[in-house]
Swiss-Prot record:
The active site is at residues 96, 234. The keyword Hydrolase applies. This is Glucan endo-1,3-beta-glucosidase GI. One of its GO terms (biological process) is defense response. Monomer. It comes from Hordeum vulgare (Barley). Keywords: Glycosidase, Hydrolase, Plant defense.
Length: 310
C-alpha cells in the first residue's frame, strides 16, 4: 500500500472533497490525517481509502490516557459516525511524542482499545507513531534497540493486540546530519551506490531506508515483540529551501520509495505499508523552511514535480 499523509497546516489548500478526489484519481489507497477532521472524514465516506487516524495533540492524548470514558467518548464522536463507510485501519495515539508525554501513550492505547471492543469496531487497530530516534544503536541495523523503557511496553502491547508499530522514517534527516558518511545516492534510492552489509546477519542494505526500517525491526525483536509489523507512517524528502532539498532529489527519493516498498526490506521481505509525507506543500508549517516543502502537490493540485504512483 502506498498512502500519503494529508496535513492541513496551511491556509490555501483545496476543500477536503477535492483532496479525496485527487487521491482517487492518482490511485492512492491510503491516507493519514493528524486529528479527527470532520471534513476529511466526511469526504472519505465510500472512497475505500485506508486511513490512519491520529487522535490529535498531546492534550488529547493525555485526556484519552486519563480515563476510559474519555476514550469511549472520543470513539463515539470520531469513529462511530464514520466507520465502516470510512475505512479506518489504525488509530495513532500520539505522533512523535517525547518527554513526559510518553507516559500517556500506553494508557491511551489501552483505553482506546477497550472502547473499540464495542460491536462492529473490532478490526480497527490502535498504535502510536514514533520518531526514528526512538531507536538507538541503529548501525548495523541488527543492533537496533529502543532508547527508552516505555517503548518496550508499547511493543508488547502491540504484540498482544496484533497492531503494527507506526514509524516515521526519514533518510533525508539522517543524510542531512551526516553527509560525510552517507552517500546521497544511498539515501535517495538512486542506483550505483555502495551497499551496506550487516556483519551480524549477513544481510545487505541497498538503501538507507531499508537499514533504518530493519533497525526498528531489530528493536522490536529485542523488546520481545518479534511478530509486530512495521508500518512506515511518514517518509519523504523536501523539494526546496534547505540542504539537499531539491525537486530532483525529492522526486528521486519518493519515486524510489514507491517503486521499492512492494518488495520490503532485507530483514522483512514482502510488501511494506508506507505513507509518504506529504500530499501538499503546507505554508504555515513552522521550524526549518524545508518543512513547508515536503508536498507531492502544490495547493492548486498541480504536481510539485513529476511522479507516478503505480
Amino acid at each position: 500500500t502506498i498512502g500519503v499523509c494529508y496535513g492541513v497546516v496551511a491556509n490555501n489548500l483545496p476543500p477536503a472533497n477535492e483532496v479525496v478526489q485527487l487521491y482517487r484519481s492518482n490511485g492512492l489507497t491510503g491516507m493519514r490525517i493528524y486529528f479527527a477532521d470532520a471534513k476529511a472524514l466526511s469526504a472519505l465516506r465510500g472512497s475505500g481509502i485506508g486511513l490512519i487516524l491520529d487522535v490529535g495533540g498531546n492534550d488529547v492524548l493525555a485526556s484519552l490516557a486519563a480515563n476510559a470514558s474519555n476514550a469511549a467518548n472520543w470513539v463515539r464522536d470520531n469513529v462511530r459516525p464514520y466507520y465502516p463507510a470510512v475505512n479506518i485501519k489504525y488509530i495513532a495515539a500520539g505522533n512523535e511524542v517525547w518527554g513526559g508525554d510518553t507516559q500517556n501513550i500506553v494508557p491511551a492505547m489501552r483505553n482506546l482499545g477497550a472502547a473499540l471492543k464495542a460491536p462492529g469496531l473490532g478490526t480497527i487497530k490502535v498504535s502510536t507513531s514514533i520518531r526514528f530516534d526512538a531507536v538507538t544503536n541503529t548501525f548495523p541495523p541488527s543492533n537496533g534497540v529502543f532508547a527508552q523503557a516505555y517503548m518496550t511496553d508499547v511493543a508488547r502491547l502491540l504484540a498482544s493486540t496484533g497492531a503494527p508499530l507506526l514509524t516515521n522514517v526519514y533518510p533525508y534527516f539522517a543524510y542531512k546530519d551526516n553527509p560525510r558518511d552517507i552517500q546521497l545516492n544511498y539515501a535517495t534510492f538512486r542506483p550505483g551506490t555502495t551497499t551496506v552489509r550487516d556483519p551480524n546477519t549477513g544481510l545487505t542494505s541497498q538503501c538507507l531506508f531499508d537499514a533504518m526500517v530493519d533497525a526498528v525491526v531489530a528493536a522490536l525483536e529485542r523488546s520481545g515483540a518479534p511478530g509486530v509489523r512495521v508500518v512506515v507512517s511518514e517518509s519523504g524528502w523536501p523539494s526546496a529551501s534547505g540542504f539537499a532539498a531539491t525537486a530532483d532529489n525529492a522526486r528521486a527519493y519518493n519515486q524510489g520509495l514507491i517503486d521499492h516498498v512492494g518488495g520490503g526490506t532485507p530483514k522483512r521481505p514482502g510488501a511494506l505499508e508506507t505513507y509518504i509525507f506529504a500530499m501538499f506543500n503546507e505554508n504555515f508549517k513552522t521550524g526549518e523552511l524545508t518543512e513547508k516543502h515536503f508536498g507531492l502537490f502544490n495547493p492548486d493540485k498541480s504536481p510539485a514535480y513529476p511522479i507516478r504512483f503505480q
